[in-house]
Design a protein with these regions (language model features):
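A glycine-rich dinucleotide-binding beta-alpha-beta segment and adjacent secondary-structure elements
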Residues: 276-342, 349-351, 369-386, 392-396, ...
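C-terminal auxiliary extensions adjacent to catalytic cores
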Residues: 394-437
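Beta1/beta-strand and adjacent pyrophosphate-binding region of the FAD-binding site
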Residues: 1-12
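Dinucleotide-binding Rossmann-like beta1-alpha1 core, especially the glycine-rich loop
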Residues: 48-59, 83-99
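N-terminal FAD cofactor-binding segment of flavoenzymes
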Residues: 18-80, 373-384
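Internal hydrophobic alpha-helix adjacent to the cofactor/substrate pocket in enzyme cavities
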Residues: 348-369
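Helical element adjacent to the flavin cofactor pocket in flavoenzyme catalytic cores
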Residues: 97-116
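Predominantly flavin-linked oxidoreductase catalytic cores and closely associated redox partners
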Residues: 110-285, 289-290
């Protein structure tokens, strides 16, 4: 039986290990938890969601919705567990954070072709290996990777997570349930603010004291997970046109849209925990309590977790990796997950999926499957391996990296729907080959 070592049991590593095992490959899965955790991890589960509990838009008019549907049709472990542990979230797919990670962990442990070895990995093993150790790779392994790749091949940015509050502590007399434009079910708690309340909150936020981030004073921040205080400093109204946007959220008490709205999204199945949408932060914890309780509905909020900030490291992938996430100079080594420069939970899963499927095919003597650029999975693989990219930055899946239609379509929503339909039709043509084990 062929053998592969997978380092890291996050979203990418778990998906990769499972896809390899499903195709008859013996997998040794190395994960440093529970012996050692990164600053962003709390539980001992695999596939722990360290930031939001949302896998973003569910519809096919969204590129991430297309990516999720492609993965579903190709028997993704992560998507199966996400769908099974979904919680109400309007037009998005959100999951019970612990229930999801527990299901992934139990599925991995129960697979006969996967052997789990806990403990920190400090060097790159011999033989075929997939490194999916994540953006918070421990220093010894990061040094081993840097030595293997040569200098100047890793970059970094900062990422942040939002606070969690208990539902019982939210003042529902000052809040209301609704989804934007009444789309889907009213799953979000909306915390309205008057102009005076918002301006006082904004002034306090931009003046609040931040936690120190040692050694990385450039404060390079990924736009998709920007700390709320960084966004606020861009201007008085930036938040009102971003995460605090009131459009489509009519307050039933006034019959009007508020001046600003803070949204809370359910974080677990029973609805006892909610997260502050768009409130990734690295303010000092006492400052978070002081500033965020200025939101009227959160004046007595019980914070179950404060926001945290951490460094994310990723590879200069276009110079290093091929479209199957393999190291060009040494193809026995592949990478997967956020460290390749894909950004987001679903994107990380997709990279692990593709790396696992293609490596299994190689070991089983089969030719690679070139996922077309018209598919979201293929577009991501081509993005991270595109050597013509000048300033490589982490990227969420988006329709901009998928080839356009050969005809004009009126309306962005209709155009995106057609792009998704084209992708899924192409996917059907290669589906059986991908699923062959």
């Amino acid at each position: 039986m062929n053998h592969v070592t997978v380092i890291g049991a996050g979203l990418a590593g778990s998906e990769c290990a499972w896809q390899l095992a499903q195709r008859g490959v013996a997998v040794t899965l190395r994960e440093m938890k529970p012996e050692k955790k990164t600053p962003a991890h709390v539980t001992d589960y695999f596939a722990e969601l360290c930031c939001s509990n949302s896998l973003r838009g569910a519809g096919l008019e969204n590129a991430v919705g297309l990516l999720k549907e492609e993965l579903r049709r190709l028997n993704s472990l992560i998507m199966r567990c996400a769908d099974a542990t979904a919680v109400p979230a309007g037009g998005a797919l959100a999951v019970d954070r612990d229930g999801f990670a527990r299901m992934v962990t139990e599925t991995i442990f129960s697979h006969p072709n996967i052997t789990m070895i806990p403990g920190e990995v400090t060097s790159i093993p011999e033989g075929d290996v997939v490194i999916a150790s994540g953006p918070l790779t421990s220093d010894p392994l990061a040094e081993a990777i840097a030595e293997k790749l040569g200098g100047g091949t890793t970059l970094n940015f900062f990422d942040a997570a939002a606070p969690l509050v208990s539902y019982d502590s939210v003042d529902m007399d000052s809040a209301y349930f609704a989804s934007r434009y009444d789309k889907g079910t009213p799953d979000y708690i909306n915390c309205p603010m008057t102009k005076e309340e918002y301006l006082a909150f904004w002034q306090a936020l931009i003046a609040a004291e931040e936690a120190e981030v040692h050694g990385f004073e450039d404060k390079n921040v990924f736009e998709g997970c920007m700390p709320v205080e960084v966004m606020a400093r861009r201007g008085e109204d930036t938040l009102r046109f971003g995460p605090l946007k009131p459009r489509g959220l009519v307050d039933p008490k006034t019959g009007k849209e508020p001046y600003a709205v803070v949204q809370l999204r359910r974080d677990n199945t029973d609805g006892s925990i909610y997260n502050l949408v768009g409130f990734q932060t690295h303010l000092k914890w006492p400052e978070q309590r002081r500033v965020f309780t200025m939101i009227p509905a959160l004046r007595n909020a019980q914070f179950l977790r404060y926001g945290v900030m951490h460094r994310n490291t990723y590879l200069d992938s276009p110079r290093l990796l091929d479209r199957y996430y393999r190291l060009k100079a040494e193809p026995r080594i592949a990478f997967a997950g956020q460290m390749t420069g894909v950004e987001g939970y679903v994107e990380s899963c997709a990279s692990g999926f593709l790396a696992g499927v293609e490596l299994a095919r190689h070991l089983n003597g089969q030719t690679p499957i070139d996922f077309p650029a018209e598919t979201a999975i293929g577009a991501l693989g081509l993005y991270v391996s595109n050597g013509s990219v000048g300033d490589f930055q982490p990227m969420n899946i988006n329709f901009g990296i998928i080839p356009p239609l050969d005809h004009r379509v009126k309306g962005k929503r209709n155009k995106n729907a057609e792009l998704s339909q084209r992708s899924l039709e192409i996917l059907e043509g290669i589906k059986q080959e991908v699923l062959w084990t």
